[in-house]
């Protein structure tokens, strides 16, 4: 995963509203790195094992921008997009329902944590879409194929997830695209929270057109 100090990003800070809402947003963004990593620790991941696959309806990794075995590409793509914007919208809703920093959820944790967890799930999904073991992209970065977890070995999958960085520790082309897409998603979240819906919609459209666009959805394998 690519971690970004979202709370220190100049654009994000400039977009934040004053006083209490600004403080809460900065706290949410500061919690993101751990929230993104923790997204991978779920019961659904149990289905990635041969034993667990018999009892759960889908592969756990399919919740992270991947396909179930035999799933049409169009359906896998739609599910992946929903895993990006569904949690992002949930994060907006949770933030808007929050009275103050100390407002507790039923899990006795701050609702700030709930917002970060939802937003972290969205970031996790968009970042997974830039792993070649999750998604095959063309030279421009357009999505060509959503990969199926059941077709892969664990070691190969893990190696692909680390391909955002080269041997010298620098971002690869995919890594740079991933970082740009992550920042754009965070911009979308902030703009939605501060009720700048027109600007947020422009961010969403750019994210879809530039970073989450299928290369040719009319070709074979992408039929409904």
Residue ranges and their predicted role:
Residues 129:
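Nucleic-acid-interacting cores, centered on viral/eukaryotic replication and modification enzymes
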């Amino acid at each position: 995963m690519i971690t970004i100090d979202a709370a220190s990003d100049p654009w994000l800070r400039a977009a934040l509203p004053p006083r209490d809402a600004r403080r809460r947003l900065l706290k949410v963004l500061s919690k993101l790195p751990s929230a993104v990593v923790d997204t991978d620790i779920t019961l659904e991941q149990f289905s990635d094992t041969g034993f667990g696959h018999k009892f759960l309806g889908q592969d756990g990794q399919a919740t992270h921008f991947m396909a179930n075995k035999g799933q049409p590409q169009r359906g896998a793509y739609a599910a992946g997009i929903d895993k990006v914007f569904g949690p992002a919208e949930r994060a907006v809703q949770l933030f808007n329902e929050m009275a103050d920093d100390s407002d507790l959820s039923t899990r006795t944790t701050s609702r700030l944590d709930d917002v970060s967890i939802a937003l972290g799930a969205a970031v996790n999904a968009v970042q997974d879409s830039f792993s070649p073991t999750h998604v095959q992209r063309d030279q421009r970065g357009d999505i060509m194929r959503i990969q199926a977890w059941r077709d892969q070995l664990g070691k190969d999958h893990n190696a692909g997830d680390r391909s955002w960085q080269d041997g010298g520790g620098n971002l690869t082309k995919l890594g740079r695209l991933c970082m740009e897409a992550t920042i754009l998603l965070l911009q979308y979240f902030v703009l939605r929270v501060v009720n700048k819906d027109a600007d947020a919609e422009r961010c969403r459209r750019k994210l879809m057109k530039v970073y989450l666009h299928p290369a040719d959805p009319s070709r074979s394998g992408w039929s409904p």
